[in-house]
Amino acid sequence: MEKEGVKNYLVLVVDIDDDIGRKAGLNTPILGREENIKALIKLGLADPGDSDVNAILGGVKIYDELKASGKDVEIATISGDVDVESEKCALRIKEQIDFLLYLYNPDFIYLVSDGKEDEMILKYLESKNIFVWKKRVIVKQSETLESTYYLIQEFIKKTMEEYIPLILTFIGFSLILYAIFADIGWRIVVGIIGLYILSEGVGVRKLLMEKIKKKEEFDVGRVFPISASISIFILIIGLIYSLSSINKTSSTLTEFIGEFLLHFVDSLTLSLLILMVGKFVDTIINSEKDLLEILKKYFFCLICIFISRELIISGGEYLLKKISFIMFVMCVIIYISIVIILSVILFTKSSKEDKFKKLKNSITKG
């Protein structure tokens, strides 16, 4: 029972990947200062380099400081599961938090962790009308080669995991673009990398992501109508240019259409690209979807545009009798197969992933 005028404090140490259970064989929640010290000693003996040891020490330090200042404070350590994105992990974290809230009824919580992935529970705590302080404990290392290697290893493990899907997706699309379009594929890849580096250099990407996270309004209007107008203008210019460039001596309608397609295809491709870029910018600004999902969708659209270009060129060359019918049919089959395979790979989601996302959303919403 909370005394009148007395505020309850809880120091909550989070080990979301359950190093305490897997390495030290301990069950959570671990309650009280003495039990937490015993736990960190046992975990430290099992793995002296584990960052959760320092997280628990950081929690004990905060506990002692609050106790010394006369606060009514408790300390507890909770853990999740080695598969941090699993339903089991989310349920374990939620159950332990609910138990601690019932047991201690805290007004203030100090959330202590060794990495940002442990802070997935922050929104859940804030939804309970509890003021939360975040404290991230980072291990200090000496400037030796082994320490540098250790820091790099931990950085990759703790930080880069969220970027690996994005990096692998980009590499995969780069290889596909090169395989289909040869030299022009590398130009596209280099252009995308250049745009990304430029956005990083001038701070556009950081500003954009901050505004998206804060759901702030942008000072600019929608880009898609402007890009649509430019695309229509390019199509009209391309149409006029293509008609004026066709050889007047074309003897048959098929030859006329073939030449028209070969002259018009670049204007059509450019207009579609501008249209796609405008839609992409609007989606990034206004959509609440995951960034990786948006990038996959528009990378796929980019490949479809260039595959359509190759098909139109093949059709024009066939009409002009530059390639055989068999070669044209093979091109159509190959490119359509690529589109089907890519769509299956990119947009087929597992039921496990869907369940986890629903569970995670329910936790963050309280």
Curated annotation (Swiss-Prot):
What Pfam family is a match for this entry?
Answer: DUF373
Its annotated compartments are: Cell membrane
Coarse class of the protein's main subcellular location: membrane
Task: List the GO terms this entry assigns under cellular component, sorted alphabetically.
Answer: plasma membrane
Its record classes its membrane topology as: Multi-pass membrane protein
Q: Where are the transmembrane segments?
A: 164-184, 188-208, 223-243, 256-276, 299-319, 325-345
Q: Which InterPro entries match?
A: DUF373 (IPR007254)
Per UniProt, the keywords (alphabetical) are: Cell membrane, Membrane, Transmembrane, Transmembrane helix
The text of the family note is:
To A.fulgidus AF2058.
Please identify the protein, giving its name as recorded: Uncharacterized protein MJ1032
